[in-house]
Amino acid sequence: MSQTSLKKERDPSILILDFGSQYSELIARRIRETNVFSLVVSNCISIKEINNINPKGIILSGGPNSVYEQNAPKCDEKIFNLGIPILGICYGMQLMVKELGGSVIPATKKAEYGRAPINIDQESDLLSDVQDKSIMWMSHGDSIKCLPVGFNKIAHTENTLHAAISNDLKKLFGVQFHPEVIHSEYGMTVIKNFVYKISCCAADWTTETYIEETIPRIREQVGNKKVLLALSGGVDSSTLAFLLNKAIGNQLTCMFIDQGFMRKGEPEFLMNFFDKKFHIKVEYINARKRFISKLKGITEPEQKRKIIGEEFIRVFEEESNRLGPFQYLAQGTLYPDVIESAGTNIDPKTGERIAVKIKSHHNVGGLPKDLQFKLVEPLRKLFKDEVRQVGAALGLPAEIIKRHPFPGPGLAIRILGEVNNEKLDCLRDADWIVRDEIKKAGLYNEIWQAFAVLLPVKTVGVMGDKRTYAWPIVLRCVSSEDGMTADWSKIPFKILERIANRIVNEVISVNRVVYDITSKPPGTIEWE
């Protein structure tokens, strides 16, 4: 069955035009939290494409540029005459004002960044139920000098005369603050007002409707052909395995490549869980010796990643040829991957988007072009939290759904320097203790990631009246919403003490434990 004959996928009710904002993805997530489907598209989208999608509302995102710059990104100005409600956020509002005959200038007082109370000047559907003098998050250096004809000022701050504007007749609205960020007290109220009161969207984007719509599409796309899935045991590939199994049953084969860098007990758990408990066909490939031999003498982290990725491809090729033939390859690509792959760079000469190379997915490590698979990517329009919801609805247990993120190269990049079996055994035991104690303390679901890192140095210690010279272990525990930024977790000292005592007493070759209290930025979550 050809791809073109497939039933049309659901169109977004709210379309988000991206002008390079760091928050565009967050806007989409916030709208979906209201049970309304939204997608992020390029600011260069054509009027014809918009009409084909027929959205209920459009949001113009913020962005790092100034609208009065020569090559500032724009959108087709006819968008404002479509009769579709539009909300401009920050740069999006300034662009709307400029395109409709108003004027934008550099801030006359000072740039406004951070929290600021807004003063509501008049009633508006956009600010309905928003409390006067509530805190909103500002991040702008330019301001509106003169509004276009038909617009009214509906809110201001101490430093911004036009904090929110409206043209009720044409249903055009703008806010200088960012309602999508958590710091804006009534931000979700503003978003809900635009989505429901102004755009009249239906709250029909739910986990149940997604599953109901997706399973028939998978069956239609695949037909009676065979599908191969590289299973890692993470929430993405696990959810995908359950979804495909529900849709096509025995046509699915999962391949689990054990490269030797998994956490303690995970290979056994995954095989027992998928193959024996839920009867999902999983081919176990023991490639531990191959991978560890390739890393002998390798200390540079990017080189380790590259070697692991290349070896994964080789193993995947060999085993897929042995088990096949397969006509389809299933990938757990998520919507953030799609957004990132589409590119967000602005050409300084033309002001248009620059296409960027599509990144390889971590589950398959960048497959070679001569593998003649057709792709099945049913999760490609979902965010991580939505994938977890789908997994829960399909029956995945909490121990997988709430599993902490784990890097594709596994423990190989949590061992700084050269990787060998002795270090892997040491780190596995230490890492298991960290997670065990965090779970016992009831903190596991409150922490984004909790793990151990093995350093490539040795330290002096004293144990049993004898001098020791052994490795130190670093504890890394962070709290985050999406992994883009993170704070180190303020774990009670008693729990840290218990973890440290267990590690130095139960793990051979470790005599010291330290706690990493670096946030991201400036640090990263992983050490390599």
Curated annotation (Swiss-Prot):
<dbReference type="GO" id="GO:0005524">
    <property type="term" value="F:ATP binding"/>
</dbReference>
<keyword id="KW-0315">Glutamine amidotransferase</keyword>
<comment type="function">
    <text>Catalyzes the synthesis of GMP from XMP.</text>
</comment>
<dbReference type="InterPro" id="IPR025777">
    <property type="entry name" value="GMPS_ATP_PPase_dom"/>
</dbReference>
<keyword id="KW-0332">GMP biosynthesis</keyword>
<keyword id="KW-0658">Purine biosynthesis</keyword>
<dbReference type="InterPro" id="IPR001674">
    <property type="entry name" value="GMP_synth_C"/>
</dbReference>
<keyword id="KW-0067">ATP-binding</keyword>
<dbReference type="InterPro" id="IPR014729">
    <property type="entry name" value="Rossmann-like_a/b/a_fold"/>
</dbReference>
<dbReference type="GO" id="GO:0003921">
    <property type="term" value="F:GMP synthase activity"/>
</dbReference>
<feature type="domain" description="Glutamine amidotransferase type-1">
    <location>
        <begin position="13"/>
        <end position="204"/>
    </location>
</feature>
<comment type="subunit">
    <text>Homodimer.</text>
</comment>
<comment type="pathway">
    <text>Purine metabolism; GMP biosynthesis; GMP from XMP (L-Gln route): step 1/1.</text>
</comment>
<feature type="binding site">
    <location>
        <begin position="232"/>
        <end position="238"/>
    </location>
    <ligand>
        <name>ATP</name>
    </ligand>
</feature>
<keyword id="KW-0436">Ligase</keyword>
<dbReference type="InterPro" id="IPR022310">
    <property type="entry name" value="NAD/GMP_synthase"/>
</dbReference>
<feature type="active site">
    <location>
        <position position="180"/>
    </location>
</feature>
<dbReference type="Pfam" id="PF00958">
    <property type="entry name" value="GMP_synt_C"/>
</dbReference>
<feature type="active site" description="Nucleophile">
    <location>
        <position position="90"/>
    </location>
</feature>
<dbReference type="GO" id="GO:0005829">
    <property type="term" value="C:cytosol"/>
</dbReference>
<dbReference type="InterPro" id="IPR022955">
    <property type="entry name" value="GMP_synthase"/>
</dbReference>
<protein>
    <recommendedName>
        <fullName>GMP synthase [glutamine-hydrolyzing]</fullName>
        <ecNumber>6.3.5.2</ecNumber>
    </recommendedName>
</protein>
<dbReference type="Pfam" id="PF00117">
    <property type="entry name" value="GATase"/>
</dbReference>
<feature type="active site">
    <location>
        <position position="178"/>
    </location>
</feature>
<dbReference type="InterPro" id="IPR017926">
    <property type="entry name" value="GATASE"/>
</dbReference>
<dbReference type="Pfam" id="PF02540">
    <property type="entry name" value="NAD_synthase"/>
</dbReference>
<dbReference type="InterPro" id="IPR004739">
    <property type="entry name" value="GMP_synth_GATase"/>
</dbReference>
<dbReference type="InterPro" id="IPR029062">
    <property type="entry name" value="Class_I_gatase-like"/>
</dbReference>
<feature type="domain" description="GMPS ATP-PPase">
    <location>
        <begin position="205"/>
        <end position="403"/>
    </location>
</feature>
<keyword id="KW-0547">Nucleotide-binding</keyword>
